[in-house]
Structure formats: C-alpha cells, structure tokens
UniProtKB/Swiss-Prot annotation:
Gene assigned in the entry: rpmF2
A single GO molecular function term of this UniProt record: structural constituent of ribosome
Superkingdom of origin: Bacteria
Upper taxonomic lineage: Bacteria, Bacillati, Actinomycetota, Actinomycetes, Mycobacteriales
Organism annotation: Nocardia farcinica (strain IFM 10152)
Keyword Ubl conjugation in record: no
GO cellular component: large ribosomal subunit
Single GO biological process annotation from the record: translation
Protein name per the record: Large ribosomal subunit protein bL32B
Protein family membership: Belongs to the bacterial ribosomal protein bL32 family.
The keyword Ribonucleoprotein appears for this protein: yes
Biased composition (Basic residues): 1-20
Length: 57
C-alpha cells in the first residue's frame, strides 16, 4: 500500500474529494400493463417479471 511522504493540505484533500460525485441512474422507458414508465436499466428485467411494483419507485 502506498504511504504518503508528506501530509496533504486540507485544501488539496477537499479538492480531490470533491471530484467523487454520485450520478443519477440512466432511465429506460419500459411498458408495463400498457403504461410507459421510465425506470433504471438494472431494474427492467425484474419489473417485466413482476418482482418489483413500478408504482412504488
């Protein structure tokens, strides 16, 4: 594991950490019971099988 030779300043630490951002999931349009809905791509298969109720998303 890398060990820093010198202490990183608070400003540099916070600038580096600010680059880590969460982004919203990409939404895909899927038709369930004749009603088009936008849902996250990773949930499409479960919604089509009826494992997840799209009303609760």
């Amino acid at each position: 594991m890398a060990v820093p030779k010198r202490r990183m300043s608070r400003s540099n630490t916070r600038s580096r950490r600010s680059q880590w951002k969460a982004k919203a999931p990409d939404l895909v349009e899927v038709t369930v019971a004749g009603v088009p809905r936008k849902v996250p791509r990773r949930l499409v298969a479960a919604i089509r099988r009826g494992l997840i109720d799209p009303e609760r998303l």
